[in-house]
Structures are given as structure tokens and as C-alpha cells.
């Protein structure tokens, strides 16, 4: 930021229902959907804004010189644009949505890794709250993401136990001084 107190925004977008299209119709359909959504998003951004694909079905948009209230308007207009978009593939028509995390970038932010993580957490919260919505980053979003990730692991471990996919190994602990097994 060149001006003191200048605010920018990062939008972290994650397409809803992309996996269904990709799995149902194949990677060709998924790739075409990504191309069309990219063109759609790009058509609504200002020349000074930056759109980038972050991976999979995730995009980042840097809104330069854009305070949070304006960024929220842009995010909602992008969300509505994607929501109203119809993707045609062969004889099928799909509707998709987009979950968007919004993070305000100021001069005193903690660096790129923090900004990306915060925007990702906000996006995760938007998805967790019901998808196809915009969520402005809150400090407790990181905790929600960690807790949900922990719950996901707990569920996976419990399923592995139920499926008898785990086996236990042990190694006795022996004192070096007298070679006796510790209890």
C-alpha cells in the first residue's frame, strides 16, 4: 500500500458444487466450467483488480484501493453473478454457487501468509454457514476451521476403528540402568 491508511481487500472464492460436475461429467467439463467462470468473474472486475486461480476450484481476487464496505458489495455482486450463471455441458444444465471469504488488507497486516490464511478461513466459514454466501473475516474464524478439522479427523479415526483398519503395536520401555521393564 503506497498511501497511509489505504485499504485493499482479498476475496477468497470457492465454487460450490464443482466436485459434483467434475465427478459426474469428467475433467473436461470441470475445466470448461473453470474457463467460463474465470471469464464471468473477470468481466465484472475493475482493470486494477487481480483475479487468480489458487488451485482446484478456488480463486483469489485482490481489490486494490477498496474499503471493506465496497469490497462487500463487489463480493456480493460476484456471488450473485455465479449464482445466476447456468453451465451447459452436453445435455445437462448445472447451477453452481460460490462461497466467498473477505479479508481487508491494511498496511499493518502480518504478511502474505497471514492474509491468505485469514481469507481462506473466512471462505471456510462461509461454506460452513450454508454455502453461496460472503463472510467477512473474524478473528475466531481460524478457531472454527481448526475445530472442524479436528472433528473431521475424529470422525475418520472412529470410522477406522469401527472398520477394524487399525492395529496396535507397542514397544516395552526398559530402563538402561538395570535392563528391567518399566511399569
Label every model-predicted segment.
Residues 2-5, 29, 171-174, 178-183:
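Short, intrinsically disordered, charge-balanced linker/junction segments flanking boundaries
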Residues 62-71, 90-93, 98-115, 140-145, ...:
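Catalytic strand-loop-helix junctions within cyclic-nucleotide turnover domains
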Residues 2-9, 16-46, 52-64, 68-76, ...:
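Conserved long alpha-helical elements within nucleotide-processing catalytic cores of c-di-GMP signaling
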Residues 27, 72, 90, 105-131, ...:
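Catalytic-core segments of nucleotide cyclases and related cyclic-nucleotide turnover enzymes
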